[in-house]
Amino acid sequence: ERKQIGPMETLEFRQAMAGAKHPWRFTAQNMSDGTLRALGVLTALFQRNPDHAPTLIGIEEPETALHPAASRALREALNRAAKHTQIIVTSHSPDLMDDPDLDADTVRAVIAEGSETHIAPLDSGSQDAMKQHLFSAGELLRLNQLAPDPENILDQQRQVSLFGEIEP
């Protein structure tokens, strides 16, 4: 619930407590960072204004400050929202990626080489392991085996310049 405090507004959270006649009330400043971040992520994912709904939502490390046990609920929310809009998520969290139904074709791996960063689809070994349900993306990440496809990286290095010339 929105609550007016002088010229400013905050959110007021209510929590039903066993044995209490009325719910406990907390303002946003008394809530954990993880709770507030989760609320922000859920708000971004489930906006339903048909005139202004986003076609793309980017979320960087949505699991930050979130209890690891909440990763599954966050994954489910991301999957539900992805049915209505394109969502790009960056994460270092194996817990968030521990979904056996995560499609290997939707995962991208990042590698830093020198002063360059490359983003590419997974290499064939990682894709096969996921498609055969031998490992989840999270398990591969824990084992340091989630790798980008080297052929795709080579293709990226042969980019067309601004004026149409192919660079080596």
Residue ranges and their predicted role:
Residues 1-30, 151, 165-166:
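Extended helical coiled-coil dimerization/tether regions that scaffold
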Residues 59-60, 91:
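Active-site flanking residues adjacent to catalytic metal/cofactor-binding acidic residues
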Residues 7-9, 35, 103:
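A generic structural signal for well-ordered coil/turn residues at beta-strand boundaries
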Residues 73-168:
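C-terminal lobe/lid and adjacent interdomain/linker elements of RecA-like ASCE P-loop ATPase modules
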Residues 53-55, 67, 82-88:
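Loop/turn-to-beta-strand initiation segments
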Residues 15-21, 27-59, 69-73:
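GG-anchored amphipathic helix commonly corresponding to the ABC/SMC/Rad50 NBD signature/C-loop
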Residues 61-66, 96:
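ABC ATPase nucleotide-binding domain "signature" loop
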